[in-house]
Amino acid sequence: MRLPPSSDTTAVSFVEVSSLHTPHSTLHEETIVVLTGDILLDRGVRKVIDQHGVGHLFSDGVDSVFKSAQVVVGNLECPATKIKSPVFKRFIFRGEPEWLDTLRQHGITHLNLANNHSIDQGREGLIDTRSNILAAGMVPIGAGENMQEAAQPVLLAEHPRKVWLVPSLRLALENYAYLTEKPCVSQEPMDSLLSHVYRLRQQDSTAVIIVSLHWGQEHKLEPVPRQRHDAHMLILAGADVLVCHHTHTLQTVENYGGHAIYYSIGNFIFDQPKPLNSEACMVRLRVSRNGLDVETIPVEIRQCVPYIK
């Protein structure tokens, strides 16, 4: 596993994209999974789309990274629905469902909904977003008709080894009731999340288990002690890597027992112009039969568009 050179906690250490080599492998010798930060399709990003089209949001460098992967997971930070039933909260977002087709055309295969904005247009808007993602040829993650469905781990790949993603929102939702039998996003207690990871590991010792958490304090550069504790517990339960988001900043990467913990990879397609919010990264996992290579790809966001640094 390629990690920042430390046995404990480090600042983010990037791998130069130009040095990354994709082997000319035969089918199933290697699976490449790329994970990105927050994707917003409203507010300032909506203005860019109205002026230039959705395709403008994907730079050549990002397209190249996506093209090299079999699986690309983005965190969709808004509902994509025609339903307008806003929840009473400070920031309310909504993207157009027809824009999802372009996300798929540029290589995104899975969209995570286990975040604090997927419910911005209510439960009906959440389920409609889920249906719209499926209709666009992508897989929705972390949302369902009830908590049991929403919290199910998602199988990203089967060869050369199974790759699972376990999503979870670790924040309280603003003015939104926690009802486990109603449409919702994955928001189980930590004990349940640990049990999911532990069961996956017990079922298959060779599987790659990715945990994706939406958590942390916005605009901060370091996680709080409770996050570190929970992250360590997830690794001990069997997770191989944690790739998290929500803070709109690039936070510390920790090497815990040889496992990478990305406490926040920052934004991806977003409209926050401050330098603090414009530095981000993607995470690329190369899964082979005999190993897992974790690579950090630096990103700079300019006028809502992510560029490879």
Feature-to-residue mapping (PLM):
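Acidic, metal/ion-coordinating pockets
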Residues: 2-309
